[in-house]
């Protein structure tokens, strides 16, 4: 599918339309016949403008939980990911499907990064993957100030836990997303978070109003 057409852009207050377009996007873009487990509920909640915390095992289809809402909502979906290699793999896979995806991280030279920034401003990107340290730069924050934002997805959200092996201090600063863009929905995702870590994610990312979706392992 060619994503030059920016997609259906459903109304947040029309649950039936969201459900219908979400399933159509799953079929048409990603080639799956049906959602699995809580995916449909998560997609509908975030596409409708709600915040979410998603705990789902690796291989459970976490990525679709933010990719589809990003395609349904107007603007660019911004995905914060700490893993450069995974970022590249996700963007490559999305481009193969015809989704307009790009990334900003330290692997890009200045010219390549500027080209991505121009594409974002032009409205030519549906999903932008950003390393947390890049997101927090004044240049990137100002870039996002100038465009319409569909959502923020915070992947590997357990990196916010100061007690965990994967702690990333930049994640503690991601409250800026809510402070700077309070109307933009946020979805935090992780495959490894016990109840204590989930509480820490909620507190440190200011997700007190987020609906929690906890899948069994």
For the regions a language model picked out, list residue spans one by one:
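ASCE RecA-like P-loop NTPase motor cores
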Residues: 2-12, 44, 96, 123-125, ...
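Conserved pre-motif I regulatory segment
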Residues: 10-57
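Conserved nucleic-acid-binding Ia/Ib motif block in the N-terminal RecA-like helicase ATPase lobe
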Residues: 23, 77-79, 84-137, 200, ...
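Pre-Walker A (Motif I) flank of P-loop NTPase domains
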Residues: 48-54, 75-76, 124-126, 185
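Walker A/P-loop
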Residues: 49-68, 78-81, 190
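Conserved hydrophobic packing residues within short motifs/helices of P-loop NTPase cores
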Residues: 55, 78, 102, 151-153, ...
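Conserved helix/coil segment N-terminal to the catalytic DExD/H
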Residues: 60-63, 67, 108-151, 159-165
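Post-DEXD/H (motif II) to motif III coupling segment of the RecA-like Helicase ATP-binding lobe
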Residues: 145-215
């Amino acid at each position: 599918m060619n994503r030059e057409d920016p997609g259906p852009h459903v109304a947040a207050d029309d649950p039936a339309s969201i459900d219908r377009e979400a399933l159509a996007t799953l079929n048409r873009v990603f080639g799956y016949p049906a959602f699995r487990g809580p995916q449909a509920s998560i997609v509908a909640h975030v596409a409708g403008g709600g915040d979410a915390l998603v705990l789902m095992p690796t291989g459970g289809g976490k990525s679709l939980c933010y990719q589809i809402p990003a395609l349904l909502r107007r603007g660019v979906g911004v995905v914060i990911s700490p893993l450069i290699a995974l970022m590249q793999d996700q963007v490559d896979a999305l481009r193969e499907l015809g989704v307009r995806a790009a990334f900003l991280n330290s692997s890009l030279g200045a010219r390549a990064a500027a080209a991505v920034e121009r594409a974002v401003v032009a409205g030519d990107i549906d999903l932008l993957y950003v390393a947390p340290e890049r997101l927090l730069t004044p240049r990137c924050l100002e870039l996002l100030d100038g465009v319409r934002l569909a959502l923020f997805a915070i992947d590997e959200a357990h990196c916010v836990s100061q007690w965990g092996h994967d702690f990333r201090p930049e994640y503690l600063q991601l409250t800026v997303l809510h402070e700077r863009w309070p109307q933009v929905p946020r979805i935090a995702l992780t495959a490894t978070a016990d109840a204590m870590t989930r509480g820490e994610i909620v507190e440190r990312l200011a997700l007190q109003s987020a609906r929690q979706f906890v899948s069994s392992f």
